[in-house]
Design a protein with these regions (language model features):
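Conserved histidines in hydrophobic membrane contexts and catalytic metal-binding motifs
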Residues: 1-366
Length: 366
């Protein structure tokens, strides 16, 4: 049986290996994007000085609105529990546009823009730099990433079968990476032992990542957890610039702040608000509220703990995929696993080429 799995392992790895390397390395580059950006652009994300009480929300929105072109409006404001973090003000367009404002001075600090490096890494990771066709044609980049990720799952599973040791002693030896017995031994150990150390996280990343590639897979994945997958339209419209009264947003913020100890961030928009918390597990978990835009009265509450599986699964998939479910510890492990995943095809190619070379040298002597 192992002979058959060796062939599967080899002939799936050879055509898809380099693509898997690109997917893994670009994914690793994205793990600490937020931390890198906050380190490089501290002037944007943090206030210069915490001084006195923050200015009213309505005043901050007014200061931001003065800088906006016609047709663009404020659609929401996010306020962190960290007094040193600047407020993030969301805009109606373009999609996901926002600016940061100092809540103590009213200074508009600048517009959020994803760094070109991380934008490239994201597009490489998801679509191999391809773009969705406006006429609805085949999205080849997304397709190739999806197929390669699916093949990677089979490569990992076949690798387990090939590697599985027969004795405890063999198990112990097969998990060692020896660096002082030649290059070939080192690359072999890195491929075999490194793959085993990263196996569980690589499988988790691949199996969750496939939900973004294939609707049929997403439907099946959701069904395993008893959830019906919602069909997306393939695009998202930016929030519309509508007439909004911001006068009661401060009242909503103050009330929700009072109700929720230990919150991470409160986001208020027109008629709704969300509260996120610094917890392990689903990093997209949030409590949701609705309010009367005319007077700020809270009219509805939807707590995350009361939501059914359909309201939780997407956030869990994302949290497992990026490794954020267990905080910094699991993110570091995910980063290392992604790097190891990227090296597996490279070390595999090296070992395969060496094997071909040895066979070619041995052939004339037969």
């Amino acid at each position: 049986m192992k002979k058959a799995f060796r062939k599967i392992h080899l002939w799936l790895s050879v055509p898809f290996g380099l693509i898997i390397t690109v997917i893994c390395f670009s994914g690793a580059a994205l793990v600490f994007e937020d931390e890198v950006m906050e380190l490089c652009r501290r002037d944007l994300y943090y206030v210069e000085k915490v001084s006195g009480a923050p200015l009213p929300v309505e005043y901050l929105i007014e200061k931001v609105s003065e800088t906006l072109p016609d047709g663009v409006a404020v659609t929401g404001i996010s306020i962190s529990s960290d007094a040193e973090r600047a407020c993030r003000v969301s805009l109606s367009k373009p999609r996901r546009a926002s600016v940061y404002v100092d809540q103590y001075t009213g200074e508009v600090k600048g517009r959020y823009e994803r760094a070109p490096f991380f934008l490239t890494m994201f597009r490489l990771h998801r679509w191999l730099l391809d773009s969705m066709k406006p006429d609805g044609g085949i999205f080849w980049g997304k397709m190739v990433v999806g197929v390669s990720t699916l093949m990677f799952v089979f490569v990992l599973i076949s690798g387990i079968v090939i590697w599985w040791p027969r004795t405890k002693k063999a198990l112990k030896n097969s998990l060692k990476i020896v660096a002082d017995k030649g290059r070939l031994r080192f690359w072999h150990d890195l491929h075999v032992a490194g793959g085993m150390y990263a196996l569980v996280l690589l499988l988790a990343m691949a199996l969750t990542g496939l939900t973004w590639s294939f609707p049929w897979y997403r439907a099946g994945f959701y069904k395993v957890f008893g959830v019906e997958a919602k069909q997306g339209t393939g695009h998202h419209d930016a929030p519309q610039a509508t007439a909004t009264s911001y006068a009661c947003w401060q009242q909503v913020y103050e009330e929700l702040k009072e109700r929720n100890d230990g919150y991470k961030q409160i986001t208020v928009s027109n008629g709704s608000a969300t509260i996120s918390f610094e917890r392990f597990g689903n990093q997209r978990a949030s409590d949701r509220y609705t309010f009367n835009p005319s007077n700020g009265e809270i009219t509805g509450t939807a707590l995350y703990k009361d939501a059914d599986a359909s309201g939780k699964i997407r956030g869990w998939i994302y949290s497992v995929h990026v490794g954020s479910w267990g905080g910094m510890f699991t993110r570091v492990l995910t980063f290392i696993a992604a790097l190891l995943g990227g090296t597996l095809p490279l070390t595999g190619y090296y070992l395969w080429i060496r094997r071909i070379g040895r066979k070619a040298k041995a052939a004339p002597n037969r």
